[in-house]
Design a protein with these regions (language model features):
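Asp-based, Mg2+/Mn2+-dependent phosphohydrolase catalytic module
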Residues: 1-126
Length: 126
């Protein structure tokens, strides 16, 4: 983090992969990339440019790389703020798996619901 802070202060482009504050692990929630980005943002007083979920660039590049249409894709994830928002913001169907970061109890209050919701990937059939 020290090297990143010094580089940004000297004019380096500040790129963040994603704004995930936490990542779920077997041991509980641990700091995610967004926590580190926020630390560096505070230290440098510089806003990052995000290139990962939920930004369009990552979805557009993935779809182009696969050579498919949006209608043939579904965004699967356990984090509403990044995974599912990637689908919603980019016109792609989404499947929220509630066994990870976003709990099932949060689904009724989400501002824009995912296309599909399952408790576990074991329930997903296509």
């Amino acid at each position: 983090m020290v090297l990143a802070t010094l580089a940004i202060q000297k004019g380096a482009l500040f790129i963040g992969t994603n704004p995930d504050k936490n990542i779920p692990t077997e041991r509980g929630l641990l700091p995610g990339a967004g926590s580190v980005v926020t630390f560096v943002e505070t230290a440098t007083q510089t806003k990052p440019v995000y290139i990962g979920k939920p930004k369009a660039i990552i979805m557009e590049r993935a779809i182009a790389h696969l050579g498919v249409e949006k209608e043939q894709v579904i965004m699967v994830g356990d984090n509403y703020e990044t995974d599912i928002q990637s689908g919603i913001q980019n016109g792609i169907d989404s499947l929220l798996v509630t066994s990870g970061f976003t709990p099932k109890s949060a689904v009724p209050t989400l501002p824009t619901p995912p296309t599909y919701v399952v408790d576990s990937l074991d329930e997903w059939t296509f």
